[in-house]
């Protein structure tokens, strides 16, 4: 009787691409020795739609509906960066009330994004129950979005110089009720997840990134803060009105998948704290800067003179971008979302470069999964939190 021969050659496995509603159309070519990962090559581009080139053939107003398709789970941030770029370029001031409304919407969107990270991440680890729990709170956030913007997703709410509409009557009370309810929900998540020995076994020490590595790879967001680097653009750049609220940067020093989970859970608590303070301090006044609603053909134009044309209802579609360049960034749920904008005295941007956080954070994946087990790939990929819409653009 001859003994069965054992093969020593490596095995190549294709993981993905999956449907965009799941982890997105990401393909991983994984080289395995048994269950040990020898190499991993991400294949990108399945969801590429030419978002940068579209921007260079549209006015900013025309382009606004497109941007919600980058990160379609945190659409307020893509809208914010799209209007912030021309606002900084032309030095447009926004009313204080509009700034507070923006902060409230951004933090609600951050919570919604982190919730839809938490559910699938736990499902990847084999815990299906939290996936159903997170939709409870997420639907309440979408109810708030629908009441304020008319849309549950793809809100199209931000405008150059402010927001599209003021908060409706009774919205603030509903938002405060949600904040009180959600804090109890976070405690429930922690009781359900954090003490689970199977969960801890799957995430502790898995996907370790040191602080130096995180900086060298250009990581941002929870990926960076989980490695001991206290860097949050809301504190660094002081955009909108974040400097008027009392909150702390959430960080961990361990640098593994568990640390990234803890950072995101803590960030949701801080977001609630910011929302409550913003609602308490929100001033009256206009929700949009009427100065944006005019053509400014001459830099020295004065009120009501011949050069000063006032438009009635909407910002001018002929909003010209002056000949200069700048880089603007916001702290999105996944990291630093930036726009490099070059204007040339025309209606369209000459260059519109998107700096997506997911694309940069994904680059470290092959290094993290090497010498790990095959089952750890989904743990590490889930802890990075990517949306292929913004990765491929």
Swiss-Prot record:
Q: Please state where this protein is localized.
A: Plastid, Chloroplast thylakoid membrane
At the top level, the lineage of the source is: Eukaryota
Q: What is its EC number?
A: 7.1.1.-
Q: Which reaction does it catalyse?
A: a plastoquinone + NADH + (n+1) H(+)(in) = a plastoquinol + NAD(+) + n H(+)(out); a plastoquinone + NADPH + (n+1) H(+)(in) = a plastoquinol + NADP(+) + n H(+)(out)
One Gene Ontology molecular-function label:
NAD binding
GO CC annotation: what is one? chloroplast thylakoid membrane
Q: Which UniProt keywords apply?
A: Chloroplast, Membrane, NAD, NADP, Plastid, Plastoquinone, Quinone, Thylakoid, Translocase, Transport
GTP-binding as a keyword of this entry, yes or no, is no
Q: What class of enzyme is it?
A: translocase
The cross-references to Pfam families, in alphabetical order and at most eight, read: Complex1_49kDa
Question: Membrane topology for this entry?
Answer: Peripheral membrane protein
Q: Which InterPro entries match?
A: NADH_Q_OxRdtase_suD (IPR001135), NADH_UbQ_OxRdtase_49kDa_CS (IPR014029), NDH1_su_D/H (IPR022885), NiFe-Hase_large (IPR029014)
Choose any GO biological process term that the UniProt entry carries and state it.
photosynthesis, light reaction
Which cysteines bridge via disulfide bonds? none
This protein's assembly is summarised as: NDH is composed of at least 16 different subunits, 5 of which are encoded in the nucleus.
Q: Matching PANTHER family, A to Z?
A: NADH DEHYDROGENASE [UBIQUINONE] IRON-SULFUR PROTEIN 2, MITOCHONDRIAL (PTHR11993:SF10), NADH-UBIQUINONE OXIDOREDUCTASE 49 KDA SUBUNIT (PTHR11993)
General function of this protein = NDH shuttles electrons from NAD(P)H:plastoquinone, via FMN and iron-sulfur (Fe-S) centers, to quinones in the photosynthetic chain and possibly in a chloroplast respiratory chain. The immediate electron acceptor for the enzyme in this species is believed to be plastoquinone. Couples the redox reaction to proton translocation, and thus conserves the redox energy in a proton gradient.
Q: Which family does it belong to?
A: Belongs to the complex I 49 kDa subunit family.
Write the protein's name.
Answer: NAD(P)H-quinone oxidoreductase subunit H, chloroplastic
What gene name is listed for this protein?
Answer: ndhH
């Amino acid at each position: 009787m001859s003994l069965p021969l054992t093969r020593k050659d490596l095995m190549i496995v294709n993981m993905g691409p999956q449907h965009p509603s799941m982890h997105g159309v990401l393909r991983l070519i994984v080289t395995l020795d048994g269950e040990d990962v020898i190499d991993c090559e991400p294949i990108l581009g399945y969801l590429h739609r030419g978002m940068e080139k579209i921007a260079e053939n549209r006015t900013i107003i025309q382009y606004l509906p497109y941007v919600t398709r980058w990160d379609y789970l945190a659409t307020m941030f893509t809208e914010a960066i799209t209007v912030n770029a021309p606002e900084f370029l032309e030095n447009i001031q926004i009313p204080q009330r509009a700034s507070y409304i923006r902060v409230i919407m951004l933090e609600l969107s951050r919570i919604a994004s982190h919730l839809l990270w938490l559910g699938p991440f736990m499902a990847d680890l084999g815990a299906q129950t939290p996936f159903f729990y997170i939709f409870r709170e997420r639907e309440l956030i979408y109810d708030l979005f629908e009441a304020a913007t008319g849309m549950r997703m793809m809100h199209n709410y931000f405008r150059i110089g402010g927001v599209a509409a003021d908060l409706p009557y009774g919205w603030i009370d509903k938002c405060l009720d949600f904040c009180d309810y959600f804090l109890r929900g976070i405690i429930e998540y922690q009781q359900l997840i954090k003490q689970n020995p199977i969960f801890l076994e799957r995430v502790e020490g898995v996907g370790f990134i040191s602080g130096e590595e995180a900086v060298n790879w250009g990581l941002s967001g929870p990926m960076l803060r989980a490695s001991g680097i206290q860097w949050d653009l809301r504190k660094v750049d002081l955009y909108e009105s974040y400097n008027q609220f009392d909150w702390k940067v959430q960080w961990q020093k361990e640098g593994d998948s568990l640390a990234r989970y803890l950072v995101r859970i803590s960030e949701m608590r801080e977001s609630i704290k910011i929302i409550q303070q913003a609602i308490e301090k929100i001033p009256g006044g206009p929700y949009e800067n009427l100065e944006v609603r005019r053509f400014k053909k001459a830099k020295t134009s004065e009120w009501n003179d011949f050069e000063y044309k006032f438009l009635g209802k909407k910002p001018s579609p002929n909003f010209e971008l002056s000949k200069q360049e700048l880089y603007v960034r916001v702290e999105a749920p996944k990291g630093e979302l930036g726009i490099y904008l070059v204007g040339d005295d025309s209606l369209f941007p000459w260059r519109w470069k998107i700096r997506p956080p997911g694309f940069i954070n994904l680059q470290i994946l092959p290094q993290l999964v090497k010498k790990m087990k095959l089952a750890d790939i989904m743990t590490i990929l889930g802890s990075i939190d990517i949306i292929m819409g913004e990765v491929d653009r």
